[in-house]
Regions:
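SF2 helicase catalytic motif II
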Residues: 99-101, 112-147
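SF2 helicase motor core recognition
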Residues: 104, 282-298, 313-321
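Walker A/P-loop
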Residues: 3-25
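C-terminal helicase lobe and adjacent C-terminal extensions/tails of nucleic-acid helicase motors
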Residues: 148, 209-216, 220-224, 228, ...
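Conserved Walker A/P-loop ATP-binding site and its immediately adjacent core
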Residues: 34-57, 71, 164
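Inter-Walker segment of RecA-like/P-loop motor cores
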Residues: 60-106
């Protein structure tokens, strides 16, 4: 009933954030005459799941616009209509990614400027707000403050693990109003899991054989186990070792990582869901991609040490519907020989912060309400973690060899002005604005490319058919474009170093602009492979 414009919805994973926030958005938009409801999620998997859920709730596909890179239209007229709609976000309900939304605020490009108008006087729902990149924290805070204080927009921040953006030393978020009251009041109602510290204290973590035994022991007891690790290499290695143990047993083993194309992952998730529902014995080894936008429920989850937000997200895949009374989530340390995160600074800082939480929890569990998923635990974790990441929160970039922050470029541009020569300063002294808007827009990117190369894989007959069109020198440009759109779900991003390592296993088509992976370098189990699969070719 209130017109406050900044809200926080804190409810446990699986407690219905999407429909609750949508219901609020519809009511609020009608009561206060808001122009749009914009639903923003950080991951494509969440968009895929929740866009369909929103459509079912609304009963009208025509008023829901999805804007992300995976939307494919084969009909040229439909494609043109879609491009016009996404240029302006001219639909009552927009479902989009954090990348598209943040680009609208900060990136260069005519389309982004046009969409800026549409986010004013709207209801904006940010799902899984804790997953936003740390580097944009202060820019995000200031933009939300602007939208709510001056843009007549209402913003809802949804998360099971709300980050303390309103408690930073500077450039903090304005204090949000809690939509669901005190989380403690309903925490017990939704409590379906218990997080258990199995990190072995100050030890170096499980070696490969120890971890396999730990997983097997839980599988023998609980029958359906999900294991989530931090690296693709660890997931593949662990999968291959567990596969040996499963030989001759009635366990069904699955692997999930971004080494697999999106269509492959969809197929695996579908088979996983069927086997879990049919009470089959299941072990799934996955990277963190399974932690969001995946409606699966295992009897037990084993999570490699990570941030508490990741651990609680993983716990959301355990006993999801309360069918097992209480589900158990084990946090384990893994040796650096099996899971090397030395070059993954973000994960290391998460692990360091979580280790401090676990150490304090062992000493005095009462201050955490005897639960690692309590509000006290989440708060303590973020106090440590955000303090470690504070220097990164203003979006550090290098412009013409000068280290500067995007926050500075968009405010006083002090660093750039100080680096100018005296003659340049003299020529520019009469400028009305000192902000470097164009430079900031040009360098802004939510997720850096990091030298990733897209490679098309020959996963199934549909992919083969489209690749054949790309290889056909007599195919028209329109046919090539349509084939490329249809091949989006069959694309895997790999590093340039990995591409070079694969050598002749990758060929190029369309004048060298599209890379295609050889069939025998793509496994039906684990995706892109460093080595040829021998006789394990894909058979159609």
């Amino acid at each position: 009933e209130r017109e406050e414009r900044l809200y926080r919805l804190t409810v446990p994973t699986g407690a219905g954030k999407t429909l609750s926030s949508l219901r609020f958005g519809l009511y609020h938009a009608r009561k206060y005459h808001k122009r749009h409801i914009i639903y923003v999620a950080p991951y494509q998997s969440i968009i895929d799941q929740n866009a369909e859920e929103i459509r079912r709730a609304i009963h009208n596909d025509e008023i829901v616009l999805e804007h992300h890179c995976n939307v494919i239209h084969d009909d040229e007229r439909e494609k043109i209509r879609y491009e016009i709609l996404t240029e302006n976000w001219d639909s009552p309900i927009i479902v989009t990614t954090a990348v598209q939304f943040l680009n609208t605020l900060f990136a260069s490009g005519i389309g982004n400027i046009r969409r800026m108008y549409s986010i004013l006087n709207s209801v904006i729902i940010f799902d899984e707000v804790q997953a936003l990149p740390v580097k944009i924290t202060k820019l995000f805070n200031l933009s939300v403050n602007f939208l709510t204080a001056f843009g007549k927009s209402t913003v809802v921040l949804c998360s099971a693990t709300q980050p303390l953006f309103d408690e930073l030393d500077e450039n903090r978020l304005l204090p949000p109003l809690s939509m669901a009251g005190n989380p403690k009041e309903y925490a017990e109602v939704f409590k379906r899991t218990k997080i258990i510290d199995a990190t072995k204290g100050a030890g170096s973590g499980f070696a490969a054989e120890e971890l396999q035994e730990f997983i097997w022991d839980k599988a023998e007891t609980l029958k359906q186990v999900l294991v989530v690790v931090n690296t693709k290499k660890c997931a593949e290695s662990l999968y291959k070792e567990i596969k040996k143990k499963c030989k001759g047993s009635d366990y069904i083993l699955f692997h999930l990582s971004t080494n697999m194309c999106a269509e492959h992952r969809r197929d695996v998730l579908k088979r996983l869901e069927e086997n879990l529902e049919n009470e089959k014995k299941v072990i799934c080894i996955s990277t963190q991609l399974i932690e969001a936008g995946v409606n699966l429920s295992f009897k037990c989850v084993i999570r490699s040490l990570a941030g508490l937000d990741n651990i609680i997200q993983a716990a959301g895949r355990c006993n999801r519907h309360g069918e097992a009374g209480m589900g158990y989530v084990y946090v384990v340390g893994i040796s650096s020989e099996l899971e090397n995160v030395e070059r993954l600074a973000e994960i290391r800082k998460m692990q360091e912060s979580m280790t401090e939480v676990l150490n304090q929890f062992r000493k005095n569990p009462a201050i955490f309400d005897h639960s690692l998923s309590s509000e006290e635990s989440i708060r303590y974790y973020y106090q440590i973690y955000l303090r470690k990441r504070m220097p990164e929160m203003e979006y550090l970039v290098s412009v013409n060899g000068v280290d500067v922050t995007l926050l500075d470029l968009l405010s006083t541009s002090k660093t750039m002005w100080e680096s100018m020569s005296e003659s340049t300063k003299k020529d520019s002294k009469n400028l009305l604005l000192k902000q470097a808007f164009k430079t900031a827009g040009d360098v802004f990117e939510v997720i850096p490319e990091d030298g990733k190369v897209d490679v098309v894989v020959r996963y199934d007959e549909k992919a083969e058919k489209q690749i054949a069109i790309l290889e056909d020198e007599y195919a028209t440009l329109a046919e090539h474009k349509k084939a490329l759109r249809r091949l989006q779900p069959y694309t895997v991003g790999i590093s340039e170093q990995f591409r070079q390592k694969l050598g002749n296993a990758i060929t190029s088509v369309c004048g060298g602009t599209v890379y295609v992976l050889s069939q025998n370098y793509y496994s039906r189990e684990t995706g892109v492979s460093e080595e040829p699969l021998g006789m394990e070719f894909i058979n159609f």
